[in-house]
Amino acid sequence: MDYLPIFLKLRDLPCLIVGGGEVAVRKLGLLLDAGAAVTVIAASAEAVIVELADRGLIRLRTKVFEATDSEGFRLIIAATDDRAVNAAVATAARRHGIPVNVVDCPDLCDFIFPAIIDRSPVLVAVSTGGASPVLARQLRTRIETCIPSRFGTLARLAADLRERVRQAIPEPRARRHFWERTLEGPAAELALQGRAEDAERVLLEAADAAARQERPAWGSVALVGAGPGDPDLLTLRALRLIQEADVIVYDRLVSAEILALARRDARRIYAGKERSRHSIPQDDINALLANLAAEGNRVVRLKGGDPFIFGRGGEEIETLMACGIPFQVVPGITAASGCAAYAGIPLTHRAHAHACVFVAGHLKDGTLQDLDWSQLVQPHQTVVVYMGLQGLPQICAELIRHGAPPSRPAALIQQGTTRDQKVLTATLETLPDKVADAGIKAPTLIIIGEVVGLRKKLAWYRSRQETEGRSGNG
């Protein structure tokens, strides 16, 4: 280990930066974040440094550095573009026993700056010992995705309530077990959502229950949008909740790759629906979610796309609210957005479509339900049809019957955003026969409008079939 990783308290301590360029500005920001009293010495300085000096936030000395300028500081940074000046700063600092950092010159450094993940008061520092700052930044980026943005809120909550929890649970081992459970429970999740007051209430209720040696109600439900298929399109919160879940209740649009992200010991319950054949009635799904949470489980209700766009998420949270079950909703990339993007079809375009309409195209008793055809045939808009595969012939026929030109472009996307994506482009008149000849199966999405014609020049994603030379682009 070439460097000892430590965190240095610099609040109100005098620190010196020599240099006034962009690098100096970056180092200045770090020192100010740490509360240091900063002096900058530079022959000329960036406007932001001058502004900070004018506001009295730093001291700026416009001059050439001299060895005597280093006296009286607790930490010095050399950030000029002149190697000789930087070396002189390092020599002067060492003569006075002051730790010095020379930017981009590890051999002259007493300390180095790591890549920082700041979730104050939680800080994570990553360093390669100066070997490769770029590699350190890349590693920081990976770690960033693992630490929720409001992790500091959770840390502050634990700090603020630490003494009250100690009084409620005086026995150290019991208190440690309490914190281990709590920092992965509903109170923690509320804090990570930014709901600090609710988190405090739930945490104190749990502490009181633990003091009485009662089992607290730890369960909760998260309605999570799994996106259109590609696992890389999951949100960071969705990924975290999937990996933390005790039980996952999922539908048929959730891919095996996404389910594989869950813990191995997580219970998986299939609740998919295929046309009118439901594996579990919706009312039973609603009750199942509430019952699983009441048993103390962290439940993820995992839905393809977005839970509030043709996902019946509203019905499920009504039941949870009625039962007093803590819940949250995590939006996902809906199929319309994801599939259109991967097919190279913009849903809006200044020259072609000023509006976009989402409709459900599933059949009930062999007929389409309650669609406003006069609105759907209007020009300069894009119509996106979910669940429309079986009703495609009727949808196209009704649009033509109500005034849409038979030549209006239309596309059907099968398994959008996945390696097996297939895109068929045609017109309202020809798409049904083309789909029938291709043997298309669900899940699919239908896009109707002039924007479909842009696919010829905007298509960028190549599925496995297209890569092998069997493109479905018509």
Swiss-Prot record:
UniProt keyword Ligase, yes or no: no
Any GO MF annotation of the entry: precorrin-2 dehydrogenase activity
Biological processes, Gene Ontology terms: cobalamin biosynthetic process; methylation; siroheme biosynthetic process
Binding site for S-adenosyl-L-methionine: P228, G304, G305, D306, I309, T334, A335, M387, G416
Keyword Methyltransferase carried by entry: yes
Region Precorrin-2 dehydrogenase /sirohydrochlorin ferrochelatase, annotated ranges: 1-203
Functional pathway: Cofactor biosynthesis; adenosylcobalamin biosynthesis; precorrin-2 from uroporphyrinogen III: step 1/1; Cofactor biosynthesis; adenosylcobalamin biosynthesis; sirohydrochlorin from precorrin-2: step 1/1; Porphyrin-containing compound metabolism; siroheme biosynthesis; precorrin-2 from uroporphyrinogen III: step 1/1; Porphyrin-containing compound metabolism; siroheme biosynthesis; siroheme from sirohydrochlorin: step 1/1
Chemical reaction(s) catalysed: uroporphyrinogen III + 2 S-adenosyl-L-methionine = precorrin-2 + 2 S-adenosyl-L-homocysteine + H(+); precorrin-2 + NAD(+) = sirohydrochlorin + NADH + 2 H(+); siroheme + 2 H(+) = sirohydrochlorin + Fe(2+)
Swiss-Prot/TrEMBL keywords: Cobalamin biosynthesis, Lyase, Methyltransferase, Multifunctional enzyme, NAD, Oxidoreductase, Porphyrin biosynthesis, S-adenosyl-L-methionine, Transferase
Positions contributing to NAD(+) binding: E22, V23, A43, S44
Residues of the active site: D251 (proton acceptor), K273 (proton donor)
E.C. number(s) listed in UniProt: 2.1.1.107, 1.3.1.76, 4.99.1.4
Pfam families, per database record: CysG_dimeriser (PF10414), NAD_binding_7 (PF13241), Sirohm_synth_M (PF14824), TP_methylase (PF00590)
Annotated coiled-coil segments of the chain: none
Residue ranges, annotated region (Uroporphyrinogen-III C-methyltransferase): 219-474
Family matches, as InterPro entries: 4pyrrol_Mease (IPR000878), 4pyrrol_Methylase_sf (IPR035996), 4pyrrole_Mease_sub1 (IPR014777), 4pyrrole_Mease_sub2 (IPR014776), CobA/CysG_C (IPR006366), NAD(P)-bd_dom_sf (IPR036291), Siro_Cobalamin_biosynth (IPR050161), Sirohaem_synt_dimer_dom_sf (IPR037115)
Recorded family membership: In the N-terminal section; belongs to the precorrin-2 dehydrogenase / sirohydrochlorin ferrochelatase family.
PANTHER family membership: SIROHEME SYNTHASE, SIROHEME SYNTHASE-RELATED
NCBIfam families: cobA_cysG_Cterm, cysG_Nterm, PRK06136.1, PRK10637.1
Function field: Then it catalyzes the NAD-dependent ring dehydrogenation of precorrin-2 to yield sirohydrochlorin. Finally, it catalyzes the ferrochelation of sirohydrochlorin to yield siroheme.
Name the UniProt record assigns to this protein: Siroheme synthase
Species in which this protein is naturally found: Methylococcus capsulatus (strain ATCC 33009 / NCIMB 11132 / Bath)
